[in-house]
C-alpha cells in the first residue's frame, strides 16, 4: 500500500513531478507527484 502526505517543504505551485519528488526525498519519502488544480506537491511512500 502507498501512503500520501502533502509536502511541508515544497513552495509554490507544483508543475513538474520530478521537482516535487526531489523535495519529498529530502523529507524522507520515496517520491512525490503534483496533485490537483492548484498543483500541490504530495509525497508518497510505502506503508
Curated annotation (Swiss-Prot):
Alphabetical UniProt keywords: Antimicrobial, Defensin, Disulfide bond, Fungicide, Plant defense
Stored CDD domains: Knot1
Domain of life, per lineage: Eukaryota
UniProt key word Disulfide bond: yes
InterPro entries (UniProt xref): Defensin_plant (IPR008176), Scorpion_toxin-like (IPR003614), Scorpion_toxin-like_sf (IPR036574)
Pfam families documented for this protein: Gamma-thionin (PF00304)
The keyword Disulfide bond is assigned to this record: yes
Purpose: Has antifungal activity. Inhibits spore germination in F.oxysporum (IC(50)=102 ug/ml). Inhibits hyphal development in P.infestans (IC(50)=50 ug/ml). Does not induce morphological changes such as lysis of hyphae and sporangia in P.infestans.
Family: Belongs to the DEFL family.
Name assigned to this protein: Defensin Ec-AMP-D2
Species of provenance: Echinochloa crus-galli
